[in-house]
Structure formats: structure tokens, C-alpha cells
Amino acid sequence: MILANSNDPDSVRLARHYAAKRAVPPGNLIALPMPLVETISWPEFIGSVYQPLQDWLVARGWIDAIGPALTDNTGRKRYSVFGHRISYLVVCRGVPLRVGHEPRFYVDEPGFASRPMFRTNQGAVDSELTLLAYGVYNINGWVPNPRFGVEQARLLESDRVVLVTRLDGPSYEDAAGLVDHAIEAETTGLIGRFYINVRGPHPDGERWLDQTAAQLANLGFDGDVDRTDNNLPASARFDAPVLYFGWYAQDLSGPMALPGFRFPPGAIVLHIHSFSAQTLRSAGTGWCGPLVARGVTATFGNVFEPYLQLTIEPQMLMRALSQGRNLGDSAYYATPALSWQTIVIGDPLYRPFAVSLDAQLANVGALPPALAPYVLLRKARLLEREGKKAEAVAVYRAVLRNTALEPGRRAIILRAAADAAHAAGDGSRAAAWEKELVASGAPPLADGNK
């Protein structure tokens, strides 16, 4: 299902663009008149978004429910819900982003009343819409996600959750790019390096990011893990950033913030910060809006303070994605709380690992010259991890035979290749590569998985 704001022509245009790209039937698009602002009140949300959408879905059999005309204190109908058949709900730019706290609707929820940070009903519109088929729930605090960490999400409780993602950004073109980049990346698979900025004030977050780094290294991706007390400097190495995970900076920074920077197709970025998605209309404030403006394919954010333990866990996200699952399934596998602050930005059907490394290697000659070395480098890294040192050196030789390699990238490969040759006991080849590296004038920066 695709949801658009009929008061915003670009919202409807975006919905039609997505439907055309993913072959979604026209009857699965619903456009409702909504306020043209990012933040709305609970009465506005119930009156213009939640209830009209739920009624539409019930009337057409997308949600299996019956119920009288009775309503709760917020104005929601008290449907008895038995399930739904909505694969994903894609919310388009123009649909409001977040719901402000409404004191009139606040009722203490057992377990939350003693914790002031949870005594609120503010939240993300998308997160509230995940519970369209849940039945009436207390809007105060948060609802545990029954899909969190569930490998086979076919239990009755899990089937009450609607998987919601958003196509949104500073401009129509930015938002449309989310699906365009996803489809482009699915033709080649995920190609590039990872970058992880571990610094932060909480042990849980550091543990998550350490686990994510280990997962990506086990998948063969070359990458850097920064453990300094600062964010990545603008001068940091940042070639082919197809995967980035970090936290605790208020606004986009480092190489990503440089003028003209663009992410490669397929890039997945998660920066953990309390208000990273407070607005999606700015290309310079926060994280999510600027990331989408710079061509990211999938990202995640928080519209209000979520508290660390209730945010998307990056290591769980990568676990699901690397198993071949799509963005929609993976994001909710990694999200502990609903009716809360987190949103998922991107095409729910995007499968970054739909193309295997073996398939990438078989097609490496057809890849753009700037991408091919990263596929071979990933294969070499896997061989090194398996102890197949001589085979890894052979792959590095194949990479370095590419005369079209940009000098900076060639120097990066030379460093890794020389280390691999030393490990394989091939001193003469290591010396030759080191000699070429010195002659190139490349700075002596450390390479690989720091």
C-alpha cells in the first residue's frame, strides 16, 4: 500500500512514481487530505490520517476487522481486528512526520508512570501507523514490537504489525531517488567499503557497533573503524561509503558534509542520535534529511528522543539484511518499540544482498571501473580470513592489473596487497608492491579493518 497527501501534488506524484517503479497496482494507492506540515496534533492525526486510512483499509478488506461506531478518548474507532494482508505501507513525502504530545490524552500506562521519559504520547506518524491492525492500544509510552528479533515472523501477534517505511527528503527529487537508487543497486549488489564511528557515551551503543564491524568484516567488506573521541574529520578516508554506522553527533559532519559529496547507489547509513529525523525538509540540519539529499538509499532516524535501548539496533539490522531480507523486514526485526520515535527511510523492497558475491565476481568485467576493485577486494579479504593467503594474493594481482584504477584507489589496494603477500611468504612480490607504493607518493595511512 502507498499513502500520499492529496493536498500536496508532489506527494501524489511520488506515490505514482513508486507504484510505477515497483509495479504496484493503482488500487493500492490512497491519497488523503492532510495538513501540509511535518508536526501535527493528535486530533489532527486521528482525524486526517489514522482513522480515514484505517477505515479505507477495513472497507476494502486489507484489514480484517469488525466493530461498532464506538470510539476511545482519542477518537479512534474500537474495531475488533483479526489480522491484515498488507505487505508494506509506503508513506510518501507530504504525509506529516510526527505527532506532538497531547496532555488531554495522557493516561498513565503501568510500567511507564514511574519513568518520566516515557510519560508522553508524542511520536512518529509512521510508528503509530504500524499499529493500524493492532486493535486499540494505549498511545502513551510505547508498545513492544512483537517482530523484534523474531526470525520467522508469522506468529499471530507479529501479523498485527504493519511494516511502514517512508520516501521523504528535502525535495521531491531526493525522495524519488530513494527508490531509484535501490533499484539501481539491486542490479549490481552492494559494492564498496564500510565506515564505523564507535565513539559514544553508552556501552550498549559501542557494543552494537563493535558487533556490526565484526559482521561486516566476516562478510568480506573492507572498512575502517574509528575509535577516537571525535567524529570523522572531513579529511578522513571515505571512498565508496556503501555502509556507515555511527552515533552521537547532532548534525551531519565529516566527509559526508563536504560540498558535492554523493553516496554510491545502495548506501545504507545509520547514525544514532536523538533527533536525527526531527525534520526531513532540511538538507543541512540533523542527519536524515542531509543524508537523503546526498543520495543515500536507506537510513533511519528518530523524530523525538527515543532513548538508546528503544532505537534500531545496527547489528540486528545487518544480520537480517545480510541474510537476504529486504529493508522493511530487516528494519522491524531490529526495532524494539512501536508507537514511538523511530522511522525507516527508503524502499521497503530494497534487498542490498540480492546479488551474491559470486554473482558479482562473475560479472566483474561489466562493472564500472570505479566499482570492480571493491568486489575483488572483498573476495581477497574473505580468502585472507579463511587462511587462503596465496589465493588472496592472486586476487590482489588481478585487481592491480586494472590500469584504469584511480591513483588513490590503487595505492589503497597496494597497501592491502603488500600486507597479504608478506603473510603468504611472497617477499619479492610484497617488495615490488611496496616499491610501487612509495613511488606513487601516497601518504602512509593505515589500511583496512583498524
List the model feature ranges, each with a label:
Residues M1-E406, R410, A423-A424, S428:
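Cysteine-dependent hydrolase recognition
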Residues A133-V136, A418, G441:
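Generic low-complexity, intrinsically disordered sequence content enriched
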Residues V375, I413, A446-G448:
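The tetratricopeptide repeat
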Residues L382, A420, L437-S440:
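TPR/TPR-like alpha-solenoid repeats
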Residues L400-E406, E436-P444:
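Solenoid-like repeat scaffolds
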Residues L414-A421, W433:
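TPR/Sel1-like alpha-solenoid repeat signature
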Residues A431, A439-K450:
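Terminal, low-structured helical/coil segments at or just beyond the last alpha-helical repeat
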